[in-house]
Amino acid sequence: MEELQGYLEKDGSRQQPFLYPLLFQEYIYALAHDRGFKGSLFYEPAEVFGYDSKSSLALVKRLIIRIYQQNDFLSAVHDSNKNQFVSHHHKNLGYSHFYSQMISEGFAILVEIPFSLRLVSYFEKKEIPKSHNLRSIHSIFPFLEDKLLHLNYVSDILIPHPIHMEILVQILQCWIQDVPLLHFLLFFLHKYHNWNSFLITPKKSIYVFSKENKRLFRFLYNSYVSECEFLLVFLRKQSSYLRLTSFGPFLERRHFYVKMEHLQMQHLILIVVCRDYFQGTLWSYXXXXXXXXXXXXXVILASKGTHLLMKKWKYNFVNLWQYYFHFWYQSYRIHINQLSNHSFYFLGYLSSLPRNSSTVRNQMLENSFIIDTVTKKFETIVPVIFLIGSLSKAQFCTVSGHPISKPIWADLSDSEIIERFGRMCRNLSHYHSGSSKKQGLHRIKYILRLSCARTLARKHKSTVRTFLRRLGSGLLEEFFTEEEQVLSFILPKTIPFTFYGSHKERIWYLDIIRINDLVNHS
């Protein structure tokens, strides 16, 4: 990393670092390995072909030599008919996958460099303290609770995916002016597509690319979502003379590299909360957050204006993707709903804004009046059906929610099995601590607890009842003790608390920057 910083300092006379020569440096690939790929870059190919971990570095050096002969190298990597590396066809495919993966992850490291430097300089310039708290997923919900209470209509939209790879590269031209690097990326993507055309259909090509080159794909996809965000904010500015009032404090959350910091489940969520043209101020808010594994980005558009205003914005979205991104998007996929009678799924919660009516009798001297008042309350509820679906896919229960054993965990030790189930319970409790109603969360905990008991009983070839009788309350304490200890520091001592979490307080944490797979149903 010191060598990399030294190169960038020497190149500081340029407007932007020239990144292409770094593809020929071994420490770039070592840096990619050290930044959390869990050895997939070096060790997985070594296991497949019988090499030890040290000899994988020799493959990296061979890769660098091949990059000097760009056309021959990429053709050899991605054309299974040319056999320049090894003589056997299957080994050629394996080496091709290894080399393409190294290029992909090495390139992803390079393109993150300018955004990393820009992020550091921005924070130093603005002197923003504790910016990591602003990137917490839970920090979004208090904002929604504050703003949505005054609005009428909402549209929850999925940014269309996928778009053509060339469009993604064109978007990068606005961020990176290194022409050789962009040409190399485009050539690499074309060769990758041609190679996979022998194995898969064109429709599945981008899906396979996203699975095999996760870091690079997420970088390209986040650049696309960031471009959508920039254009939407620009359109909103052009449509109204009203200035942004609450946009400034969250400006650093729109920074591109912030969206890239946690790449395992990292995607952008753009929330645009606006009013009618002549009825008040405009709020615009963007946050980096974890999204579904299917790489879906959500746009929440809410308005205090009329249904016609929302309909105009609906067609703005359609025209934006059709004419700017060359992506055909059906207008019927965007639904406009009233906030008072609509629940939308957002970041692992079912959010709604129900109306509560109450009657108050007012006595003034000899006259009495009956006043009907209507209040709104922002509610966030655990999506039980979605979570049960996720548990069913993970083989913890049936589709109807009946707990079953986890056979693949039966070979683990008892303590490891209990620890894994307990960790899942604690993670779900931690994330869904902001739920208005805890009954759904208790049901999910019950499913996991009984699934744990069935797994242990299966391992010891016993019945669940016999095993629980022998185990006693130890299993229950494993699932709830840690949650009780955490909440005891947060809730006042006067609030009663039991193992079953009977409290109704909503708690939002500032340390949640990604969503567990089971939180998302997709």
UniProtKB/Swiss-Prot annotation:
Gene Ontology terms, MF aspect: RNA binding
Q: Which HAMAP family match?
A: MatK
Q: Where in the cell is it found?
A: Plastid, Chloroplast
Question: What name does UniProt use for this protein?
Answer: Maturase K
Assign the protein's first listed, main location to one coarse class: plastid
Q: Which family does it belong to?
A: Belongs to the intron maturase 2 family. MatK subfamily.
Arranged from A to Z, the UniProt key words for this protein are: Chloroplast, mRNA processing, Plastid, RNA-binding, tRNA processing
Which InterPro entries does the entry link to?
Domain_X (IPR024937), Maturase_MatK (IPR002866), Maturase_MatK_N (IPR024942)
Can you tell which superkingdom this protein's organism belongs to?
Eukaryota
* Single GO BP term: mRNA processing
Function of the molecule: Usually encoded in the trnK tRNA gene intron. Probably assists in splicing its own and other chloroplast group II introns.
Q: Please name the Pfam families in this protein's record.
A: Intron_maturas2, MatK_N
Might you report a single GO cellular component term? chloroplast
